[in-house]
Amino acid sequence: MPRELLALYQNGNYVVKLYSDGTKIKQSIENSFISAFPDSIDLKITNYCDQNCPMCHEKSNENGKHADLDAPFLKTLKKGTELAIGGGNPLSHPSLLPFLRQMKEQGVICNLTINENHLKTYNDLVLRLIHEKLIYGLGISLKTYNKQAVAFAMGYPNTVLHVINGIFTDYDKIANPNVKILILGYKKVGRGITYFNDEISKQMNITKEILPSLFDKFRRISFDNLALKQLDVKSLISLEKYNEIYMGDDGESTMYIDLVNKEFAKSSTSTNRYLLMDDIIPMFKQIQVIH
């Protein structure tokens, strides 16, 4: 199936092309990319979750609250902006559907991250979101091998399996040329502080050792910035390959927004938090990193 161009826009001194398969291309005639607004936002919409994962950096649980999804700044999001929506369990939010419809109407591109165990519980809703094009990318967080999640990823090519460095070990079991994975850095934040142990540290070293052999086993392997650092990916692959997967430092064109606590930051691990404003641009300028 040919990929569709979802968005083409100018952001500061560069042009962004965003395709339906998740490919994002940034082009500039200058040596650096300086954003006028965030082209990607990590958006937390709930702290409710029934999984109680011991490494959860958001400390989500069954007492967690849902956020109000009518914050004024949401209406100021630019067409083509990507939202990586998560929680908690975002599928449990009672206003998820109308919120996604509002974002689609604004031209905002929504992606959703869910826990592997919620794929079965909310399967009909997930399929509805995909078929109605309310979301374009689906991230499924895995702790161990999950047959249903791998099958789903093979059937819906915009699905990415999310695994945490040091936690996930079953790379060979999920390896498939039709599967995309995202390796996330282990966050020593929230419950992740006390859960970290020598076994996790050992597994992080093992993952670093086997990483070069994994690239040919998957359709695509990508990393968040924390994983890039923890695994020292730059030393393991060619500079050309690294430049393909590296999209800039946190805060250059990205930011984190916690709608539950009504605050924003450079990333979800940032200790410097600021209260929400009514417009996305001054919010972004507050945390923006310019090189």
Where are these regions (language model features)?
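Radical SAM enzyme [4Fe-4S]-AdoMet core and its adjacent flexible, acidic
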Residues: 133-281
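N-terminal [4Fe-4S]-dependent radical SAM core
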Residues: 1-43, 252
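Short Asp/Glu-rich motifs
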Residues: 121-124, 193
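Core AdoMet radical
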Residues: 40, 58-67, 79-93, 103-122, ...
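Cysteine/selenocysteine-centered motifs that mediate thiol-based redox chemistry or coordinate metal-sulfur cofactors
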Residues: 285-291
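Canonical Radical SAM [4Fe-4S] cluster-binding loop centered on the CxxxCxxC motif
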Residues: 31-69
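Residue-level recognition of short loop/turn positions
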Residues: 52, 87, 260-261
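Generic structural signal for well-ordered alpha-helices
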Residues: 71-74, 96-100, 126-127, 150-151, ...
